Amino acid sequence: MKSPAPSRPQKMALIPACIFLCFAALSVQAEETPVTPQPPDILLGPLFNDVQNAKLFPDQKTFADAVPNSDPLMILADYRMQQNQSGFDLRHFVNVNFTLPKEGEKYVPPEGQSLREHIDGLWPVLTRSTENTEKWDSLLPLPEPYVVPGGRFREVYYWDSYFTMLGLAESGHWDKVADMVANFAHEIDTYGHIPNGNRSYYLSRSQPPFFAMMVELLAQHEGDAALKQYLPQMQKEYAYWMDGVENLQAGQQEKRVVKLQDGTLLNRYWDDRDTPRPESWVEDIATAKSNPNRPATEIYRDLRSAAASGWDFSSRWMDNPQQLNTLRTTSIVPVDLNSLMFKMEKILARASKAAGDNAMANQYETLANARQKGIEKYLWNDQQGWYADYDLKSHKVRNQLTAAALFPLYVNAAAKDRANKMATATKTHLLQPGGLNTTSVKSGQQWDAPNGWAPLQWVATEGLQNYGQKEVAMDISWHFLTNVQHTYDREKKLVEKYDVSTTGTGGGGGEYPLQDGFGWTNGVTLKMLDLICPKEQPCDNVPATRPTVKSATTQPSTKEAQPTP
């Protein structure tokens, strides 16, 4: 193994010092946090466990979302008194003591709507308001209205919302975009971070960090005022993701931060709890029991951390793609997460400059530059020719190609030559008749083949366009839009995910039935419609023939190629 150049340790040592300065100067730790609402598995203890294990409801999320009609301690005391009595009926007890979530009314769109008209008509249908909630409700109140994904997802979700907001902006609903940014800022101020969703059982983790990009989106409409207004919350979120960095030694990890042997700082997904997820209680217990060679708490943490990634679940996190109990999310450094952290640092630099703090802007630029070098060094697989995740156990970059590999292009963190290789890999290994495959592995998990997801289609499309790869970008958009249109023509709805091995079929796999609505699919579909059709002639449905790309190979990316580590 080569010895590092004499100057390298000194150079790397600057990075932690910079972070300490950023945090100390800004005092960005979350404000005095109120008492954190307890999730239902803690509030209800053995009653929650017994109800979920009895499988009273087809979906475990149903009871997790149920609202106690009185003090949970009193309900639990009554349960302990009654449970062993002759003729005790658990379902009746639940019906008496809890208000179950109502099934949403099935939305029937007006006849003859175009795809665009259908989406525009859905925004009010998917809008919710929970300024006040019941005392023991798992639902967390938010000050402004928000748009939910749809179906079983009755709350707002973090990373879903960015792609939903792209569609809201495309529809001209900037007021709703502003409301959702305000809600997420409220969560940061209240809880110190943005939880997976606005439920008490989601508070122990976050999701892919898109808040800074949401603020940047709002700034397209409101200008730098939005960047300055939400700079404190962006700083607090950054502090959450970097929490514990000041105590890390080389080769150590703490919560969401990883410090590699040469001092490079990267991030991973993490959940603060190591118990079954309340919304998937029975499934998680079964997964842990199926692998007695691992501590159950370790499996629970990795299941929860995979949920934090948004990719729940995928062969990406597993040693054996056919066995969920081999997932080890916390020992993997994800390429998409670190691309988003790079983007967060760049936006923080821009916002600091807008606020007149050039010194702090330079500090964030230094952090972004260091992370970019880390991405190029550790998250590029030179043998395969694509970006990939880094394995903390093997100390090597992994071999699997996934749609997450397009994230460095999406945030303009990729070297030009590597972006070109990514375009080739994407077209060769991931592009299918109905869009971009999530991976090329068929595991039965929903974040694997043959499923394609709207956010990943948009990340790939935008990322490839950033580097002048307009033909491949158009192929992805065209194939996915055709899939969405064919499904809509037949079923009059948009869905959460699609089978991209064909067109006109919703995706499968995972822990629950296919959901419709659907927030992020609506948003990405609108963005893609406006991408493939000229502005002077916007299209309301997907055209019958694929549009040509004008100057597809012109205007190469202005991004300078980074030196190969």
UniProtKB/Swiss-Prot annotation:
Positions bound to substrate: 152, 159-160, 196, 205-207, 277-279, 310, 511
Statement: the UniProt record of this protein carries the keyword Hydrolase: yes
Keywords: Glycosidase, Hydrolase, Periplasm, Signal
Coarse class of the protein's main subcellular location: periplasm
One GO MF term: alpha,alpha-trehalase activity
Enzyme class: hydrolase
Record-listed E.C. numbers: 3.2.1.28
Active site: 312 (proton donor/acceptor), 496 (proton donor/acceptor)
Sequence segments annotated as region (Disordered): 538-565
Catalysed reactions, semicolon-separated: alpha,alpha-trehalose + H2O = alpha-D-glucose + beta-D-glucose
Comp. bias intervals (Polar residues): 548-565
Compartments where located: Periplasm
Function: Provides the cells with the ability to utilize trehalose at high osmolarity by splitting it into glucose molecules that can subsequently be taken up by the phosphotransferase-mediated uptake system.
Complex and partners: Monomer.
NCBIfam families: PRK13270.1 (NF009773), PRK13271.1 (NF009774)
Family: Belongs to the glycosyl hydrolase 37 family.
The protein's name: Periplasmic trehalase
Organism of this sequence: Escherichia coli O139:H28 (strain E24377A / ETEC)
Chain's gene name: treA
